Swiss-Prot record:
<dbReference type="GO" id="GO:0005829">
    <property type="term" value="C:cytosol"/>
</dbReference>
<feature type="binding site">
    <location>
        <position position="361"/>
    </location>
    <ligand>
        <name>ATP</name>
    </ligand>
</feature>
<dbReference type="InterPro" id="IPR041872">
    <property type="entry name" value="Anticodon_Met"/>
</dbReference>
<dbReference type="GO" id="GO:0004825">
    <property type="term" value="F:methionine-tRNA ligase activity"/>
</dbReference>
<keyword id="KW-0963">Cytoplasm</keyword>
<comment type="subunit">
    <text>Monomer.</text>
</comment>
<feature type="binding site">
    <location>
        <position position="153"/>
    </location>
    <ligand>
        <name>Zn(2+)</name>
    </ligand>
</feature>
<keyword id="KW-0436">Ligase</keyword>
<protein>
    <recommendedName>
        <fullName>Methionine--tRNA ligase</fullName>
        <ecNumber>6.1.1.10</ecNumber>
    </recommendedName>
</protein>
<feature type="short sequence motif" description="'HIGH' region">
    <location>
        <begin position="21"/>
        <end position="31"/>
    </location>
</feature>
<dbReference type="GO" id="GO:0046872">
    <property type="term" value="F:metal ion binding"/>
</dbReference>
<dbReference type="Pfam" id="PF19303">
    <property type="entry name" value="Anticodon_3"/>
</dbReference>
<feature type="binding site">
    <location>
        <position position="166"/>
    </location>
    <ligand>
        <name>Zn(2+)</name>
    </ligand>
</feature>
<keyword id="KW-0067">ATP-binding</keyword>
<dbReference type="InterPro" id="IPR023458">
    <property type="entry name" value="Met-tRNA_ligase_1"/>
</dbReference>
<keyword id="KW-0862">Zinc</keyword>
<comment type="similarity">
    <text>Belongs to the class-I aminoacyl-tRNA synthetase family. MetG type 1 subfamily.</text>
</comment>
Length: 601
């Protein structure tokens, strides 16, 4: 049984839960290298393999960061969140991320589901009230989220540890633990005051969490390392904050307090569930979400950057265990939600850096997605992230490497194979020619391409994107070498052999295009049409205006792309092809574009 067959037998329902980008500004390429492109490659492959996929996410619209940005722009927090949600949704549509639903945390549905989870945890005994020393910005008196406080880790000495965890050693922290704490907003030392909050009682869930994590042997090593480090010293974690911008706390005496709200990290992770419920209602099947959340045979994959591992590998599973009543204190699942599935796999990427620094809005090392798409289109970025992105280690983005990848791999190798194969077939036949008797060289190339579906598919099923696209490009290299060796342009006196070579080349182009579809769906559609295909090969998300806010959805059932060889049809008319990939000016490697120069002055 092939690797692809084994995956297809596992289950039919696959949840692709994609980290929620924060709506306090446009997203940069570092963001989409962590959550965006990897999740879409995976979701598209799973759909092509016959799975029923639900890919959900949305804009994270609550919390102090939104309030701070709103103050800077002289607008309300609601207006700020709505503005950037609209920008982010448009960018993600342009990138071709095939969400079944991309929404936001501003919906009534999301508030209701968040409060239902909070209430069930509270009733099951996993939410406790206690006092703590809260951090406040001295200049404004506004609460400082843990992630807005930096300092030196008391465990490993890392200088840029955050108030909730150290990204270097993975240790869970409180702001008061940091050595030399400072506000990321102003650089001032925070003011600590006693305040009362509700906490998620993670110690009461520790044993269940440890037992569950021990079963996650196929997770990426970086995720397992972080998760085990976090389990060593679990402590209660605050899930409310002194802030007027957020979801109200569903507890008597707190519900009407305008200065108490649910902590943004808590409501954000619940977004995967609330978005699934919203999706089901929007398609007219209000219980369809249960097929992905209550069905024990369903599988769920969570995509994020490494700075979000803590929330997805330990805290979100802890919330789910507590909601299900599976911690030390027992309890019952929510009657409304039922028993909820825990994550099958956490697919975490490392950081994309620029000149060794993390791509960051606050640090000035930024290439915004919208700018990139406007100049280079989506597939150049998608390809770069897949083949050279931070899948397993921090990766430095340089314009030199980007230009090299586009010009020498996309244009010279893959684009050249497509264009010369179709051009020669059009020039000589004006249609897909029939193959005569096959030689060993013909069969060898066709067999290599056919085998690629198992190899590439098996890698994609295990979220090994870089290895998968590298294997597809290896087949491109074999095909180019085959054409160079067979020299069909010299076979005018042997048209049967010429047509056979061209038929083999076109079949391999079709095969590789299928393998490339999850990575580069826009160019895959063009190549499909260049081969005479009609209709939708790779569907794209649609931006839909609803209730005054945009969402992304898509009718992916209309697409014809499926995983495996599609035999080309002899006699299909061909047209003279246009180049699929535009070569970039070599000077760009040294200068960068005007909006993101290599050496900004």
């Amino acid at each position: 049984m092939s690797a692809t067959d084994r995956v297809n037998l596992m289950c039919a329902n696959v949840l692709a839960a994609v980290a929620w980008p924060y709506a306090n500004g446009p997203r940069h390429i570092g963001h989409v290298s962590g959550f965006g492109v990897p999740s879409d490659v995976f979701a598209r492959y799973m759909r092509m393999s016959g799975h029923r996929v639900l890919m959900v996410s949305g804009s994270d619209c609550h919390g102090t960061a939104i309030s701070v940005k709103a103050d800077q722009e002289g607008v309300t927090a609601q207006e700020c969140a709505e503005k950037y949600h609209r920008i982010i949704a448009a960018d993600l549509q342009g990138l071709g991320l095939s969400y079944d639903l991309y929404t936001s945390t501003l919906t009534d549905n999301h508030a209701h589901v968040t409060q239902e989870i909070f209430t069930r945890l509270h009733e099951n005994g996993y939410v406790v009230k206690r006092s703590e020393m809260g951090a406040f910005e001295p200049s404004t008196g506004r609460t400082l989220p843990d992630r807005y406080i930096e300092g030196t880790c008391p465990v490993c000495g890392y200088d840029d540890a955050r108030g909730d965890q150290c990204d270097n050693c993975g240790r869970q922290l409180d702001p008061a633990d940091l050595i030399g704490p400072r506000s990321k907003t102003t650089g001032a030392a925070p003011e600590f005051r006693e305040t009362e909050h509700f906490f998620l009682d993670l110690p009461a869930l520790a044993e269940s969490l440890a037992s569950w994590i021990d079963t996650r042997t196929d997770w990426r090593p970086n995720v397992l390392k972080f998760s085990h480090n976090l389990l060593e010293e679990l402590r209660p974690r605050a899930i409310t904050r002194d802030l007027d911008w957020g979801i109200r706390v569903p507890v008597e005496g707190w519900q009407d307090n305008p200065m108490k709200s649910i902590y943004v990290w808590f409501d954000a992770v619940i977004g995967y569930l609330s978005a699934s419920i919203e999706w089901a209602r929007r398609i007219g099947r209000p219980d369809a979400w249960r097929e992905f959340w209550n069905d024990e045979d369903a599988r769920s994959y969570y995509f994020m950057g490494k700075d979000n591992i803590v929330f997805h590998s330990v805290i979100w599973p802890g919330i789910l265990l507590g909601t299900n009543g599976r911690g030390d204190k027992g309890g019952e699942p929510s009657e409304e939600l039922g028993t909820l599935n825990l994550p099958t796999e956490i697919v975490s990427s490392e950081f994309l850096t620029m000149s060794g620094s993390k791509v960051s809005n606050s640090r000035g090392a930024t290439i915004f997605v919208g700018d990139f798409l406007h100049e280079f289109g989506p597939d150049a970025l998608r390809y770069f992230i897949a083949v050279a992105g931070p899948e397993n280690q921090d990766t430095d983005f340089t314009w030199e490497e980007f230009v090299r990848r586009v010009n020498f791999e996309l244009a010279n190798e893959w684009g050249n194979l497509v264009n010369r194969s179709i051009s020669m077939a059009f020039k000589n036949c004006h249609e897909i020619p029939a193959a005569g008797e096959l030689t060993d060289a013909d069969r060898e190339l066709l067999d290599a391409a056919a085998a690629g579906f198992d190899t590439v598919g098996g890698l994609l099923a295990h979220a090994r994107f870089k290895a998968a696209i590298t294997e597809a490009m290896r087949i491109v290299g074999l095909a180019n070498a085959y054409i160079s060796a067979e020299e069909p342009w010299k076979l005018k006196d042997n048209p049967e052999r010429r047509d056979t070579v061209l038929h083999v080349a076109l079949q391999v182009v079709s095969d590789v295009n299928t393998m490339m579809t999850p990575f580069m769906p826009h160019s895959a559609q063009k190549i499909y049409e260049a081969l005479g295909g009609e209709g939708v090969w790779a569907a794209q998300p649609e931006l839909i205006e609803t209730d005054g806010a945009p969402i992304l959805m898509g009718d992916y059932a209309t697409e014809q792309a499926s995983w495996g060889r599609h035999e080309i049809t002899v006699g299909t008319p061909l047209s003279k092809p246009s180049p699929i990939f535009r070569k970039l000016d070599a000077k760009l490697a040294q200068t960068g574009p005007q909006w993101a120069p290599v050496n900004p002055q």
